[in-house]
Amino acid sequence: MFRFIKKSTNTPMLGVDFGSSTIKAVAVSGSAESFSIDSWAEIATPKGAIRDFQLQDVDRVSQAFKQLLRMLPGKYKNAATAVNGSSVITKITQVASNINQIDFENIVMMEAEQLIPFPLDEVSLDFEVLGPNITDPARNDVLICAARSQSIASAISVFNDSDLTV
């Protein structure tokens, strides 16, 4: 599923929170086992640019984000953020553990069609196997996460405008 810092990387990364009142960034480096916070910055979100967890005015958010980047020491190439609010759905389902990866992924997609209240062509979908189900060890608990693609595209647009890789 989503990985904040890959185990083998020492590449500095920005973690960014696009909030309705402020945009915050924290610069981290290291690995998943041993990381450090190098710096952080915060700037006011342009009024009305983010409402109900959604970027309403990508251009104004992008300009504010560029100002925030100038407040941080150093240059960064990678960024990560989270999406939240009503555009994100998470569900846990169970899938048989004795099937191959391709069948497993197909079953997860069929489960997602039943569980996610949005058309699947409008969402970005990911899943993570949580492990054996407590009551039925022959099945795995699987966390399915779906976010409206438009929500993700807006954040990616802000990062791309600042030459950052998501």
Cite the ranges covered by each PLM segment:
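Charged, flexible boundary elements
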Residues: M1-F4, L164-V166
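N-terminal phosphate-binding loop and adjacent alpha-helix
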Residues: S39-R70
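Gly/Thr-rich phosphate-binding beta-strand-loop-beta motif of the actin/hexokinase/Hsp70
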Residues: F2-A44, P73, K77-N84
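Short, glycine- and charge-enriched coil/turn segments that flank and shape catalytic ligand pockets
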Residues: E33, R51-R60, G131-R139
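Switch/connector loops and helix/strand junctions flanking conserved nucleotide-binding motifs
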Residues: F35, R51-F53, V88-I92
